[in-house]
Amino acid sequence: MKKLVLCGALLLAVAGSAFAQSPQKPGKWNVKMQMEIPGMPFKMPPINVDVCLTEEDLKDPQKSVPSDPKSKCTVNDYKVDGNTVTWSMECPKDKTKGNGEITFTDETYTGWMKMQVGEQEMTTKYTGTWKGECTKK
């Protein structure tokens, strides 16, 4: 279960920031994420967070995916086709791999990611809404 929660955090990071040279624009984004895990005795609650992305965050998918450095996750097969971004990723230490797709409009995005964590599969659906410029705290 701990791996699934950590994986969920990684998925959120990917949805929020792993889009180098993508149509996503910098600023404050509200990200909603719903994980579906077959065989779980309960439904995972949706996650809703705000993420602030800079121009620098959007340049390198490898640097923009926050994860445990010990996991040594890599983003592979990263492609931008018009307003759609696709990718695959792998975290060998955690035996995690997956792929996903996100399609952007000017101020929204929708997408999905499928992950294999050991023997467990999960699908995450995303929606994102641009909320404006980031504010300093």
What is each model feature region?
Residues 7-15:
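Bacterial N-terminal signal peptides
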Residues 21-137:
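Subset-of-secretome marker
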Residues 16-20:
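Sec/Tat signal peptide C-region and signal peptidase I cleavage site
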Residues 6-7, 52:
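Short amphipathic alpha-helical "recognition" segments used for binding
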Residues 1-4:
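Positively charged n-region of N-terminal signal peptides that target proteins for export
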